[in-house]
A protein has these predicted regions:
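N-terminal export/targeting and maturation segments
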Residues: 10-77
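Soluble non-cytosolic domains of exported or imported proteins
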Residues: 25-29, 89-92, 146
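Mature extracytoplasmic domains of secretory-pathway proteins
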Residues: 56-121
């Protein structure tokens, strides 16, 4: 299992429509960067905005045998943060497990489709349908809160470093702050 941790754009951006979204995502030069941009620009805008949008995801499986439909199954999360003093405080975010379809056009990649697992009583049947042979692997990682928290910690530490932020702590709503 490869764990992918990615940092998104500085601001949460409201979703764009149709081909505009694809043109923005075409700026990504590899499919992981395309996923980061998609999560930051299309998914993060579904939540209350923060100063920073930070995608965190675990790759479950990849099929990159066809550059016109690279398929990445994963447990995709988006967190929106605002900085207060030395602490990044989570203002919103959520989980979006599913299957990303990424297309290569020339040297650029963009997300062409995202099949998301449904909520509520449809979660299990839709997860089984979308993840198929990778369902058990998905379940193991999706159910491991400690693994996700460790991954999120590492992603946030890299995000703070890469963006020159002064934060030394992060805090999820209702929980004590944790050191980066």
């Amino acid at each position: 299992m490869i764990i992918i941790a990615a940092c998104g754009n500085k601001q949460a951006v409201a979703p764009a429509e149709g081909d505009e979204a694809r043109m923005v995502n075409e700026q990504a030069k590899d499919y992981y960067a395309a996923i980061d941009r998609y999560l930051s620009e299309q998914i993060a805008g579904q939540y209350a905005p923060g100063e920073y949008s930070v995608p965190v995801y675990q790759e479950v499986a990849v099929d990159d045998s066809d550059s016109t439909d690279i398929r990445i199954w994963g447990d995709f999360w988006v967190y929106n943060y605002k900085q207060e003093g030395d602490t990044l405080k989570c203002v919103s975010g959520g989980s979006h497990p599913g299957l990303m379809h990424v297309c290569q056009k020339g040297e650029y990649f963009y997300v062409s489709d995202f099949e998301q697992v449904e909520d509520g009583s449809r979660f299990l049947p839709s997860a089984k349908r979308i993840f198929g042979e990778y369902f058990e692997t998905f379940q193991i990682h999706h159910s491991d809160g400690d693994e996700h928290e460790s991954l999120k910690h590492d992603v946030l530490r890299a995000f703070v470093r890469d963006h020159g932020l002064t934060a030394t702590w992060y805090q999820d709503y209702g929980w004590p702050a944790k050191e980066l």
